[in-house]
Design a protein with these regions (language model features):
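Hinge/lid segment of periplasmic solute-binding proteins
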Residues: 18-71, 125-128, 216-220, 287-289
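C-terminal capping/gating helix-and-loop segments adjacent to ligand/active sites or protein-protein/ligand interfaces
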Residues: 279-280, 293-346
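Extracytoplasmic "Venus flytrap"/periplasmic binding protein-like
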Residues: 1-47, 82-84, 89, 186-187, ...
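A structural signal for short loop-to-beta-strand junctions that line the ligand-binding cleft
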Residues: 5-6, 11-14, 41-79, 229-231, ...
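Glycine-centered hinge/linker elements that transmit conformational signals in sensory
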Residues: 99-103, 144-176
């Protein structure tokens, strides 16, 4: 149903979708300022805030959430049993993540690894790694997105964790260093990875495969370096109204309707997709798989974030970005976090 909703939106030429580039498009004048309309919503506080904040420039609001895709931690319960781990307990800290991944690695089974990382995909890497930094209460960018703040203890702890796995036999799946994101989720889906961060939009396929006799999957929020603290990357698509639209009122009617609890239930919850309305997440999934409720909880708890920078794509997502090079250096090479952080800032502040 996500694609039906997306297609319906795209048939309206006045509506535009964006992801991590919301601030860029807003600052370039692509969207209509709908601050008054958004602030006038009775349920604004019930909406997932990441996509609203990402599309806010100089106090003006341009976007609302449409498709919400969040990152969670998944693990293979079958491999956990073989490794002598509790199959019902995923990692509650980065140190536990490493410990559990190394236990699976020690099975020394053909093609099986503790974890997996998309080493050449800046987008997958921010989706996987930023939540652990946020969980610790640290930041990845300054407020206006012009400076990287990755030179902190939490980021270092996360990078050290993956470096430890990279230096462990079977710690990271073969191809992690070269993974462009094209087959990022496949190794876990194929039953070859113990535990890794994962997009919630891909978990449905895991659950369906499980019903057909596949391995059982565990799901938990992504932890930080401090036990019990979690966060998520609020990804997906935000939606705004084109600056050139001659039908702003009609477009707003559609957007305001889509934000309502009733519409969120019909369009998203009833079709097994993730709503962006907190009240819908709390009330419309009571009969859903408990793991779906766990996924929803990472949005409900309000700890998730969407990074905000006009130059986010160039600094993080683009092939060969300074962020991608930071990961390559920190996990598989010689790390200089201060210098690599500055290289990201140099792009952000152009």
């Amino acid at each position: 149903m996500i694609w039906k909703a997306r297609s319906a939106a795209l048939r309206r030429p006045t509506l535009c979708l964006t992801s991590s580039q919301a601030m860029y498009w807003a600052s370039e004048g692509i969207f209509t300022d709908i601050t008054k309309q958004i602030d006038g919503l009775d349920n604004k506080d019930d909406l997932q805030q990441g996509h609203i904040e990402a599309g806010t420039v100089d106090g003006a609001e341009y976007t609302l959430p449409f498709i919400t895709d969040v990152s969670v931690m998944v693990w293979n319960k079958e491999l956990y049993k073989k490794a002598g781990l509790d199959p019902d307990k995923g990692p509650s800290s980065i140190s536990e993540f490493v410990e559990q991944a190394k236990k699976v690695a020690a099975l020394n089974e053909d093609g099986v690894a503790g974890s997996y990382l998309a080493g050449q995909s800046g987008g997958a890497l921010v989706f996987d790694l930023f939540p652990s930094v946020w969980a610790d209460g640290e930041t990845v960018l300054n407020d206006d997105g012009t400076e990287a703040t990755l030179n902190n203890d939490s980021m270092k702890g996360v990078l050290d964790a993956y470096k430890e796995l990279a230096n462990t036999t079977n710690g990271l799946g073969a191809g992690s260093k070269e993974e462009t994101g094209a087959t990022w989720t496949a190794p876990f889906a194929n039953g070859k990875i113990g535990v890794m961060p994962y997009p919630n939009t891909s978990t449905t396929a895991l659950f369906d495969a499980e019903k057909d006799g596949g391995f059982e999957v565990g799901v938990t929020p992504i932890p930080g370096t401090k036990e019990g603290k979690t966060s998520t990357f609020l990804g997906g698509d935000a939606m705004g109204i084109s600056k050139d639209s001659k039908h702003v009122a009609q477009a707003w009617n559609f957007l305001s309707w889509l934000m309502s609890n009733d519409a969120q239930k019909k369009v998203f919850a009833d079709n097994g997709d993730t709503a962006s309305n907190i009240q819908t997440l709390k009330t419309a999934y009571k009969d859903a798989d408990p793991r779906v409720q766990t996924i929803n909880s990472v949005i409900i708890d309000g700890n998730g974030k969407t990074p905000k920078s006009a130059a986010f794509n160039e600094a993080f997502n683009a092939a060969g970005s300074p962020w991608q090079l930071l990961i390559q250096n920190a996990v598989w090479g010689k790390s200089d976090l201060k210098a690599d952080n500055q290289a990201i800032t140099d792009v952000l502040d152009q």
